[in-house]
Amino acid sequence: MCIRDRLTTILTYSIAIPLGITAGRHQDEWQDTSVQIFNYITLATPGFVFYILGLWLFGFTLGWFPISGSVSANASGFWGVFGSRIYHMILPAILYALITTTSTVQYLRTGIVDNKVEDYVRTARSKGVPENVVFHKHILRNSLLPIAAFLGNTITGLLSGSMIIESVFS
């Protein structure tokens, strides 16, 4: 697994876990609706279209990221080349992470919503345990277990989806 795939995995979970927690904790409120709209848009948009739009917006229009290559021509020395490689990896990694967050967000949201009504949560609330403790110790802990198991599926998806990313950003 290359560095970009590792960066993408870290970004995927860094984006997906807070979004899933927000959507699950605020079920049927505006936060949940916003996360669901984001999920549906990223799920319905084909990857190559999403990548080309991101490349056009952040590469051509705004000029924040390079549009091709893997190292700048004027990079010299180890740290210059290393920094240039990271700079060239950021846009593909972010765009791919945004696409791959959808399933993780949905799994986590569904787990939180399902665990909210379990007997052990109801028992903890009836004992007078503060809601924040109930959420972190009972609901969130049990909802994150499927996400940890889903990591293997995410890694295999990254390896297969790298071909599309490489063809768009080459």
Which sequence ranges carry the predicted segments?
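Hydrophobic beta-strand positions within the nucleotide-binding domains of ABC ATPases
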Residues: 1-2, 41
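Alpha-helical transmembrane segments of integral membrane proteins
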Residues: 4-31, 47, 79-170
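Membrane-water interface segments at transmembrane-helix boundaries in multipass membrane proteins
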Residues: 36-45, 49-101
